[in-house]
């Protein structure tokens, strides 16, 4: 669909895909939160806030404050995700991989072989940039573009991954929802690019974000828009424009894994720093100038009245109130037993409260269970490299088929992306001299 200028102006005023684009951006931020090894909350502020707000609703205020003190980058979840992707990376080392290209002239085949290696950095680009984009930007878009000025005998098309947050609006192709009829996205220097099935245009915008002038226009004879979604696997039937990478379905489990990992750290503090308790001694704090004195950790004035602060709370004793916070390494004073009935209290006057072993074991086991569940769900049955339990031949076959199914899904996505890029580049560079191609990443 070739867009007219007035259509582009209307789209800029009222883009139809704004909500879908924002959903994709938010989902990718959650992926980054659990995938990338960040060192500061500023790198991924929004998903961090969402996670901590969720935890805040689960815990009492004092426990949440402790959780915040223990929450620190880098997080433990990227290590789990890294283990998952280390298993899935085998998709690049499959057997019997092959690719073939047909041209009307054999010399063009040699030219293409050199061009895709030297100019497109294939096949390495799929193992590096493509692999990373799959992990954190499955909603990114593959764009095949042309330089504004042709400097050689043949056109020199190139491709890149366009982040979804740079997109203004788009319309997908009716017969293939991964390809576009047209695409409009932001460019540097307050410009926009418009891709459709007849041309590639760049417009300059004014301060009001209105089209000011046409910067460049490159006509093409592709018959389709030279852009498509990088990843083909849809999130679900209702959200076909949102793409699902291998760990998308495990984002909630990753949240829980992070929660229990940090909760375990809290429990771990009680091992080297248990809570000590002993019979309380009367606090003898007294302010000689004002007459204020301590009564049970709070202040009374010279008249015996509690001292009320501006916020309505009773003022705490500056000497002993901090001793009453129960945390790792705290010292608590407990009331002296009442011996009015003449019964002697035989308890140890100084006691140590250690961590409850069952609570610690539960957190340790739950972390291990969640990690194993995440790995198996993404990688396939028998997700770990080593198996402690003996398994029979049928189980071995089932595990192999489970893993193979996962790798085949990855393989298909990369094959479709690579074929689109290479076919489009070949058509732009060689025109009708390019016949067809075949891309197979093997088994």
Per-range role (PLM):
Residues 233-390:
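Extended, charged amphipathic alpha-helical segments
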Residues 109, 113-253:
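Extended, regular secondary-structure scaffolds
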Residues 3-23, 34-69, 288-312, 328-356, ...:
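Short, charge-rich amphipathic segments
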Residues 355, 359-362, 366, 395, ...:
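Non-transmembrane, amphipathic alpha-helical segments
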Residues 87-91, 104, 218-239, 338-347:
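Short, compositionally biased low-complexity segments
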Residues 369-386, 390, 400-443:
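C-terminal helix-loop subdomains that flank or include functional centers
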Residues 75-79, 88, 121-133, 139, ...:
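Intrinsically disordered, low-complexity boundary segments flanking structured domains
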Residues 1-162:
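Extended, helix-rich architectural segments
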């Amino acid at each position: 669909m070739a867009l007219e200028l007035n259509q582009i102006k209307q789209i800029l005023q009222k883009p139809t895909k704004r909500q879908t684009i924002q959903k994709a951006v938010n989902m990718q931020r959650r992926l980054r939160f659990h995938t990338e090894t960040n060192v500061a909350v500023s790198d991924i502020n929004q998903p961090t806030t969402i996670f901590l707000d969720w935890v805040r609703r689960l815990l009492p205020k004092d426990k949440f404050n402790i959780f915040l003190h223990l929450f620190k980058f880098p997080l433990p979840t990227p290590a789990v995700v890294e283990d998952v992707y280390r298993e899935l990376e085998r998709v690049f080392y499959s057997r019997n991989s092959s690719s073939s290209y047909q041209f009307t002239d054999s010399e063009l085949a040699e030219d293409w072989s050199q061009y895709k290696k030297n100019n497109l950095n294939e096949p390495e680009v799929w193992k590096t940039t493509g692999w990373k984009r799959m992990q954190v930007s499955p909603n990114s878009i593959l764009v095949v573009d042309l330089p504004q000025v042709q400097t050689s005998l043949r056109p020199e098309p190139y491709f890149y991954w366009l982040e979804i947050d740079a997109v203004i609006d788009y319309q997908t192709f009716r017969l293939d929802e991964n390809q576009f009829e047209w695409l409009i996205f932001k460019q540097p220097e307050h410009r926009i690019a418009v891709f459709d099935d007849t041309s590639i245009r760049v417009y300059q915008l004014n301060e009001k974000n209105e089209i000011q002038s046409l910067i460049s226009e490159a006509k093409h004879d592709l018959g389709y828009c030279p852009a498509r979604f990088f990843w083909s696997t849809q999130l679900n039937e209702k959200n076909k424009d949102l793409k699902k990478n291998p760990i998308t379905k495990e984002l909630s489990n990753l949240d829980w894994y992070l929660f229990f990992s940090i909760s375990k750290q809290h429990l771990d503090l009680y091992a080297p720093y248990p809570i000590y308790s002993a019979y309380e001694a009367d606090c003898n704090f007294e302010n000689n100038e004002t007459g204020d004195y301590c009564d049970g950790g709070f202040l009374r004035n010279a008249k015996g009245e509690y001292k009320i602060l501006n916020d309505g709370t009773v003022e705490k004793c500056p000497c002993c109130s901090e001793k009453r916070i129960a945390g790792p390494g705290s010292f608590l004073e407990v009331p002296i037993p009442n011996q009015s009935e003449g019964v002697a209290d035989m308890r140890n006057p100084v006691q140590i409260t250690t961590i409850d072993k069952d609570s610690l074991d539960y957190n340790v086991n739950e972390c291990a269970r969640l990690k194993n569940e995440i790995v198996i769900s993404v990688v396939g049955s028998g997700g770990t490299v080593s198996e402690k339990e003996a398994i029979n031949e049928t189980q071995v076959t089932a595990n192999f088929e489970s893993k193979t199914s996962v790798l085949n899904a990855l393989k298909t996505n990369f094959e479709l992306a690579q074929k689109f890029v290479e076919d489009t580049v070949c058509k732009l560079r060689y025109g009708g001299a390019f016949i067809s191609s075949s891309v197979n990443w093997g088994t």
